[in-house]
Amino acid sequence: MAQGSRAPSGPPLPVLPVDDWLNFRVDLFGDEHRRLLLEMLTQGCSNFVGLLNFGVPSPVYALEALVDFQVRNAFMKVKPVAQEIIRICILANHYRNSRDVLRDLRTQLDVLYSEPLKTRLLRGLIRLCRAAQTGVKPEDISVHLGADDVTFGVLKRALVRLHRVRDALGLRASPEAEARYPRLTTYNLLFHPPPFTTVEAVDLCAENLSDVTQRRNRPLRCLTSIKRPGSRTLEDALNDMYLLLTLRHLQLRHALELQMMQDWVVERCNRLCDALYFCYTQAPETRQTFVTLVRGLELARQHSSPAFQPMLYNLLQLLTQLHEANVYLCPGYLHFSAYKLLKKIQSVSDARERGEFGDEDEEQENDGEPREAQLDLEADPTAREGELFFFSKNLYGNGEVFRVPEQPSRYLRRRMFVERPETLQIFYNFHEGKITTETYHLQRIYSMMIEGASRQTGLTPKRFMELLDRAPLGQESEPEITEHRDLFADVFRRPVTDAASSSSASSSSSSASPNSVSLPSARSSSTRTTTPASTYTSAGTSSTTGLLLSSSSLSGSHGISSADLEQPPRQRRRMVSVTLFSPYSVAYSHHRRHRRRRSPPPAPRGPAHTRFQGPDSMPSTSYGSDVEDPRDDLAENLRHL
């Protein structure tokens, strides 16, 4: 770059409103679910999500790349599923708002190309073609001015004809107009901007797109409508033809993108069902909501214009229940763990049928003991009914991944379980220039759930199944989880260390802050209750999300209040700047503009501050030794006042 030249400035940033609900529509989400979405999103990404929800017309692939947000730590356990559900909610909300933009565009275009303005536009087109004398007929262009099916090919053919007319008249775009071309896609990423020749035409088109996107209910304008009859030129007629043709094509392209986005939202929900099925196996109490969601998706695929509200309601309702289940959602890892265990069981079973022990590639033990120990059978010495063995590799036996629900007979009985026969584990290979796959059917998910539940209740799987069948009849009580908290240390509470005590004492003696914690008295033995990193919440939600405190820790505490809880680290606001797509970088620019700090005021200047005395009495490099310092004259003038 040559010295003294400046880099070209980016396109101007739009101004889009973001309400308190981050532009989530009330006709798609209830107040409870909108509040849930706001609680899950961090404050730093809230404005950016509001811009995405506004519905700026965009290609589906660009919108997929732009959607970005952060989930609060309070929802860390459900984060893998919450991220996908929030993304679907943003896409559906964007679709509805963008559909309203298209409806306004169609209405405004019909109003613009109507009498008496229609007659004046056609007269200008006729004068334009006659003056050019290129053989271009006015009918070849006017037939598309009122059409709703101006495809990209039709648009290119019409623009070629207009370019012939433009070249014949010797019209060219001015450098000032070309410098303003980026404004044409600020409020609409689907618009194909034509080569307007004047600054006035570029600004007028940008204002029209801005009014339509922001739904200001202002009529579309063209140069023919705002200029008097005596002041209209052939160049104005040419720019009006550019405007009408590209807006007609924008109308069709926007409609096609909305159809693709509508189908893509349903497809994302359909793909999410694979993960939601394993989430259902982790929290069986979500059975009814999950079944309702799948049935709704089946109906949505059968309609050309499905309603998103029932589907979004079931998704957020399922997410709420999964969050209340308080388990780590890991559908992909759970899928793979089930495959590893079932494949090992199958290999051992096949070896026993052949009269062999272990796998073919494994050596036998020295004492000849079968290799069934490779299944990692683990004994449970705390069980009451003798010695029990369970699969230690069964992830359903982990209480943080799968937890036996209350009244398990309502959800874990065989006839209440939702079967999925085609649960596949797929591996990809490359053979002879082709991609091949190996599939394994996972058909024992229910057995793994029962084995994991029996381990948590300290029963054999057979006894656990008997209780499930007899409990609804009142013959037996519901199986309950066996707690072993007294065998392990309680890591959810820890005493205040000396360093923390000294720092807390020093902070209490100084100016008190809202997050300061007062020390208990020396006669009291109370401890400071803290939360682990996985349960950090904001100060506004710490009382609602709850703490994972064990019963033993609660019995040993004395008057623990919310002020004694450890506060989470303050999270800095984070705005995502996407410079390639200007409509969505306004949040970052707006954020920086409000956080910019003013420079400190200059040092005081007065009689005591000259080049011979004062805090900066050292000779300055900007003045020569023989040049008078302007501060000397200022000091003399102040002395004579």
From Swiss-Prot:
Q: Where is the composition biased (Low complexity)?
A: 500-563
Q: Which segments cross the bilayer?
A: none
> Where are the annotated segments for Disordered?
353-373, 500-572, 587-641
Q: Biased-composition ranges for Basic residues? A: 589-599
Biological process GO terms, please?
Answer: DNA-templated viral transcription; symbiont-mediated suppression of host cytoplasmic pattern recognition receptor signaling pathway via inhibition of TBK1 activity; symbiont-mediated suppression of host toll-like receptor signaling pathway
- One Pfam short name: Herpes_pp85
**GO terms under cellular component:** host cell cytoplasm; host cell nucleus; viral tegument
Stated name of the protein = Tegument protein UL35
Q: Source organism lineage?
A: Viruses, Duplodnaviria, Heunggongvirae, Peploviricota, Herviviricetes
